[in-house]
A protein has these predicted regions:
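Acidic, surface-exposed loops and disordered segments
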Residues: 16-361
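Sec-dependent N-terminal signal peptides
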Residues: 5-13
């Protein structure tokens, strides 16, 4: 009888929490009265990539023409991103999607990045102004279809035309290194060695375990992190993956060593690496880097070039300190992207939160 009573109380508490959450959500929706157009623009913003799919962004709607973009401190990656460098880059990608998505509804977006975090952790202001745009279907298609590809790529040279189209996005900050070039070989080796070192770091393992989803139910509830599909475990593979994987197994030597072996194959099987640098590590420069990165990813989707961010080389010593010099660059490297053609380009599988999960009052 006692067990039943406690179970009943537990279910009532859970039901109560769900009820409060729904009431709160409805209240926010009704109170803010956001237009369907702005809702869709925000949704397209949320399709941006982020480390561990942590989705570190929030927004505050001042009015239909003015939006504040905030860093969500509750989604900070303490071990792999202690300085919030990648968080700001991800926010920049969110902003770029917002800017491009707004064209669908004939809005030009002025972006004003801040020099420091606001009291509410705001980092940028977006101002929407009416302006007519045409032929936006391809822009929206690329936003909707963009995704990271973590499979092995074909070891084929990128077409000169494709390289030029990508480099034209930002010639001063984007460089391509062919896999067989001297610097391409340095990147291949360094990206792998850095991943190997980072993979055995306990703090990084704990952080990774927090963001790996262990069931379809958890993935559906949290709407973030890495599901089986995002890790290449679709179909029959997922059927076996979820029952076998726990937080403990994620940190096991077998799991870690398996990841290291996969990383080695990934670094060796591609066309080369794109490197994105910035003038400094300021908030505005990192946001600009994120915007540049997203422009690259959207163009790559159009060209059907697979892209896989490989960030460990920018987290771990000695590589994070030496990479700019080794590549002959005088400014900080912010992103390293493995690129190449693939037999099957695939489709997006990333989890995404609803727009009402990221809007704050």
């Amino acid at each position: 009888m006692k067990k039943v009573t406690w179970l009943g109380m537990f279910l009532m508490i859970i039901a109560g929490c769900i009820g409060v959450e729904k009431e709160s959500e409805i209240k926010v929706k009704n109170k803010m009265n956001i237009s369907p157009e702005l809702q869709d623009i925000i949704r397209m913003g949320t399709l941006a990539p982020s480390s561990h799919n942590a989705q570190m962004w929030k927004i505050k709607i001042v009015n239909e023409s003015e939006i504040l973009v905030l860093w969500d401190k509750n989604r900070k990656l303490e071990s792999s991103d202690p300085q919030n460098r990648e968080a700001l880059i991800s926010i920049g990608a969110f902003i770029e999607n917002f800017v491009e998505g707004a064209k669908k509804y004939n809005y030009e977006v002025e972006v004003k990045s801040f020099n420091s975090f606001g009291e509410d952790n705001s980092v940028a202001k977006l101002i929407l102004n009416k302006k007519e745009f045409t032929n936006t279907d391809n822009i929206i298609k690329n936003i909707e279809e963009r995704h990271s590809v973590k499979t092995l790529f074909l070891k084929e040279d990128l077409k000169s035309k494709d390289i030029s189209e990508i480099l034209d996005i930002n010639k001063s900050n984007v460089t391509y290194y062919d896999l067989e070039s001297e610097k391409g070989k340095y990147l291949k080796e360094s990206v792998y060695k850095a991943f190997e070192k980072e993979a055995i770091d306990k703090g990084v393992q704990d952080e990774l375990a927090k963001w790996i989803r262990l069931s379809d139910k958890e993935a559906k509830e949290k709407k973030d992190g890495m599901s089986a599909e995002m890790m290449g475990m679709g179909g029959i593979k997922k059927y076996f993956y979820y029952p076998l994987v726990t937080e403990k197994t994620i940190k096991s030597n077998i799991f870690v060593n398996s990841g290291i072996k996969v990383a080695k194959k990934q670094t060796e099987n591609c066309s080369g690496y794109l490197v994105v640098k910035s003038s400094s590590n300021s908030i505005s420069d990192l946001i600009d880097t994120g915007r540049t990165m997203e422009k690259i990813l959207l163009k790559a989707n159009e060209l059907k070039i697979a892209v896989h961010p490989m960030s460990a080389v920018l987290h771990v010593e000695p590589w994070k300190d030496e990479i700019s010099g080794k590549l002959g660059l005088t400014e900080p490297v912010q992103m390293v992207l493995r690129v190449g053609y693939v037999k099957e380009y695939g489709e997006p599988t990333s989890l995404r939160r609803d727009i009402w999960d990221i809007i704050v009052e």
